[in-house]
Amino acid sequence: MKRTFIMVLDSFGIGASADANKFGDEGADTLGHIAEACARGEADIGRSGPLTLPNLSRLGLGKAAEESTGKFPVGLDKNADIIGAYGYASELSSGKDTPSGHWEIAGVPVLFDWGYFSDVENSFPQELLDKLVKRANLPGYLGNCHSSGTVILDQLGEEHMKTGKPIFYTSADSVFQIACHEETFGLDRLYELCEIAREELTEGGYNIGRVIARPFIGDKPGNFQRTGNRHDLAVEPPAPTMLKKLVDEKGGEVVSIGKIADIYAHVGITQKVKATGLDALFDATIEEMKKAGDNTIVFTNFVDFDSSYGHRRDVAGYAAALELFDRRLPELMALVKEDDILLLTADHGCDPTWPGTDHTREHIPVLVYGPKVKPGSLGHRETFADIGQTVAKYFDLSPMDYGKNML
């Protein structure tokens, strides 16, 4: 029975890539800098002391990071008994965003340039805004700028509730984000507005990767809170991913947990499981692993590393989340049967010690575990697509156009 379990620790980079200078990210190191801050006692909120990741260390995380940066992460166990194959991968794709990273993991790098709204103020073309107001029958809009999603709620959330005007904002990523109050504006209405925005962006040729619905609750600055009802409207990958090939060629199952289905525009996904928060994502993953039959991929995105800690530059929160993940990792490993493969990786970096609030261009860890996987170094992988090619080979699918089999 062939089953693969892919866990994406969203934004968990392990050192700047060779082209990081093109992105302003030379020297970024999500894992390394978190570990250093912990060792200095600068991440003692809700946790304390050096970063402790014994189970990830046994899978080779520390050694992969050392291969990536030349430095072993402070606090991790140098003498851990390695039970998995480990390496690090560079990104071929032109961006450091979520879709690019995930599509490349699935064997389809993004070699074209996304469109971006690069103006910090008045970010969106007036023509686009006018169409959205008209088609969605809006009283107007707020924002129209670059912003952190939490900051803009404190700035404009109250006005949004009073006026019914949605909050439009973007970032350094190829995104059009819409924040609306779940109760005063309504969730269904927000989703409808996002569908209209997706259509207008596509028809207008803007080449924007994602429209993101950002629902929130609360009644005043300081207690506004984004909910788990986020919804991403992505464009479809430009070629068949290994997910789609498994479904098409083998009649296989691909179970999405978290935001995976949205990232791939639901192409190559046969089942979607919703869960919010690290523990809930873990619980859902365990349930689906127990149920998984032959020719199945269970694919989970642990978004909180990125959305709650990376972008918010919360070092202690990121460290605590990693330690929680590590504590629960044996629950996943215990469900790995003789022919199974468990793959742990990331989609980009988001160094919480780095200036700004955006992603960082970094290598990602590639940690592979299974009874038939030979422990040891996989070395430097030149593209995330090596993961997709490896999975395609494992399931006896037609080869991907990019990537090399690692096993």
UniProtKB/Swiss-Prot annotation:
Metal-binding listed as a keyword: yes
Record EC number: 5.4.2.7
Source organism of this protein record: Yersinia enterocolitica serotype O:8 / biotype 1B (strain NCTC 13174 / 8081)
Pathway stated in the Swiss-Prot or TrEMBL entry: Carbohydrate degradation; 2-deoxy-D-ribose 1-phosphate degradation; D-glyceraldehyde 3-phosphate and acetaldehyde from 2-deoxy-alpha-D-ribose 1-phosphate: step 1/2
Gene Ontology biological process terms, A to Z: 2-deoxyribose 1-phosphate catabolic process; 5-phosphoribose 1-diphosphate biosynthetic process; metabolic compound salvage; nucleotide metabolic process
PANTHER family: PHOSPHOPENTOMUTASE
Binding-site list for Mn(2+) 2: D306, H311, H359
Function statement: Isomerase that catalyzes the conversion of deoxy-ribose 1-phosphate (dRib-1-P) and ribose 1-phosphate (Rib-1-P) to deoxy-ribose 5-phosphate (dRib-5-P) and ribose 5-phosphate (Rib-5-P), respectively.
Pfam families membership: Metalloenzyme (PF01676)
Residue numbers binding Mn(2+) 1: D10, D347, H348
Cofactor, how bound (note): Binds 2 manganese ions.
Protein name: Phosphopentomutase
Reactions the enzyme catalyzes: 2-deoxy-alpha-D-ribose 1-phosphate = 2-deoxy-D-ribose 5-phosphate; alpha-D-ribose 1-phosphate = D-ribose 5-phosphate
Family membership: Belongs to the phosphopentomutase family.
Broad class of enzyme this protein falls into: isomerase
HAMAP family associated with the record: Phosphopentomut
Keywords: Cytoplasm, Isomerase, Manganese, Metal-binding
Classification via InterPro entries: Alkaline_phosphatase_core_sf (IPR017850), DeoB (IPR010045), Metalloenzyme (IPR006124), Phosphopentomutase_DeoB_cap_sf (IPR024052)
Subcellular location: Cytoplasm
NCBIfam families registered for this protein in UniProt: deoB, PRK05362.1
